[in-house]
C-alpha cells in the first residue's frame, strides 16, 4: 500500500494510507536502519507499506523530488511565503532571500502571499502594486490575501498538494489557514500546537490533512537559518536564468566578472528590480556560505 509519512516521534513513524484514507503507525524495515547506503525515512516521504502480522512495515521509499533539512521534510509541492505589507512592514530583501532559497532547493511552485493590504495607505498600495507586477514578470504568482478572489484562486492552486507555509509570526498565517480550509477549525487544538511551537522544537515537523492534501509549517523568518553557497545563490534568481547562460564563465557570480550577461542585462534595463538585492545578499556570504537570518535585515517598502 502506498502511503505518506506524516509524523516521526522517536522511532515511531505515522503514515497516511492513500487508498484507505486513514493514519496508522508503521515501522521502517531493518534495511533502512542498518544500511548506510539506503535513504532514511523522513516526513513527507511517499513510501510502500506492508501489513505483516499485526505490524505495518515501511518496505520502500519512493524517489524524492525535493527535500529540506530544516524543517526536515520531503516532497513539497508548493511553498507559500506569507509577508505582511504593514505591521510588520514588508521586507523585500528577506523575501528575495527566501525565494532564492526555495528555488535552489528544487521547489518548482513558490508563491507569494501579501497580507494586511487593506491596512496600507494609497501611497503604499501604489508601491506594492508596482512590486507585484515586477514579481509577476519574474513568473512568481502573487496573491493579495485580503481579496476574496485571490483566496479562491489560491484554494484551487493548493488543492490536493503538500503545502509548506513560511512566514514570521504576526503576518496572518493562522487567519489564512482558516480561510483556505475552514474545516481546520474542527481541529483547533492540533492547529494551535502546530503553529505555536517553542523555539527548541522547530526541527520537529508534522504534516496535517489540509485542503485535500497536506500542510507543513516552517519556523518564522527570524528563526529559520538556511545555508546557500555563492554559486547556488547565483543560480537561484529565476529572472537571471534567460541571460546567465550567455555569461563567459559557467560559474559567473555576476559581480565583477568580464563578459557577464547579467550585468549587461541590468545596464540595458532588462533586469531592473532584484539585482541590487542580489548584490547585497552575495556580499553577506562568509566563506562561500549564506546563513539567512532575516531579522537582521531592515529594508522596508514604504
Swiss-Prot record:
Give the keywords, sorted: Cytoplasm, GTP-binding, Hydrolase, Metal-binding, Nucleotide-binding, Ribosome biogenesis, RNA-binding, rRNA-binding, Zinc
Q: How is the cofactor bound?
A: Binds 1 zinc ion per subunit.
Q: Which sites bind GTP?
A: 115-118, 167-175
Any GO MF annotation of the entry: GTPase activity
Domain CP-type G span(s) in chain numbering: 65-224
Task: Please give the family membership noted in the entry.
Answer: Belongs to the TRAFAC class YlqF/YawG GTPase family. RsgA subfamily.
User: What PANTHER family does the entry give?
Assistant: SMALL RIBOSOMAL SUBUNIT BIOGENESIS GTPASE RSGA, SMALL RIBOSOMAL SUBUNIT BIOGENESIS GTPASE RSGA 1, MITOCHONDRIAL-RELATED
Q: What is this protein called?
A: Small ribosomal subunit biogenesis GTPase RsgA
Which species expresses this protein natively? Ureaplasma parvum serovar 3 (strain ATCC 700970)
User: Its gene?
Assistant: rsgA
